[in-house]
């Protein structure tokens, strides 16, 4: 997963890639208990969840604020928070179980 994401997003630092690895591991683990995503293969997650979430980031000004409505498993909000620490992004979802997962992810990643 790390190699694929690094190839797709060469601007990510080693520390950020490590955060994405942790996020991926938690996503796969929690997905066994609750339906967070249909995609769990490393290359698919790297491309279709992580890299796709970061596509518009070059157009977003420094210090911007956003809200990820219906974030689900955290896409695109968590990848944005990892890749752009200058951006404040609020994650919003209607299901408490998803928010519990996201709280655990954010705590583990220090975001």
Name each model feature, range by range:
Residues 63-72:
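Conserved class I S-adenosyl-L-methionine
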Residues 48, 66, 83-87:
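Alpha-helix termini
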Residues 1-63, 97-100, 104-109:
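Class I SAM-dependent transferase core
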Residues 88-93:
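Conserved SAM-binding motif I beta-strand of class I
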């Amino acid at each position: 997963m790390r190699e694929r994401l690094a190839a797709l997003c060469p601007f990510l630092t080693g520390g950020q890639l490590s955060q994405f690895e942790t996020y991926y591991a938690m996503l796969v683990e929690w997905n066994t208990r609750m339906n967070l995503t249909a995609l769990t293969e490393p290359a698919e997650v790297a491309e279709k969840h992580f890299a796709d979430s970061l596509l518009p980031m070059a157009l977003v000004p420094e210090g911007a604020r956003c809200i990820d409505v219906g974030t689900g498993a955290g896409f695109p909000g968590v990848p944005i928070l990892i890749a752009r620490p200058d951006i404040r992004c609020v994650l919003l979802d209607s299901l408490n179980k998803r928010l519990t997962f996201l709280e655990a992810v954010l705590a583990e990643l220090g975001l």
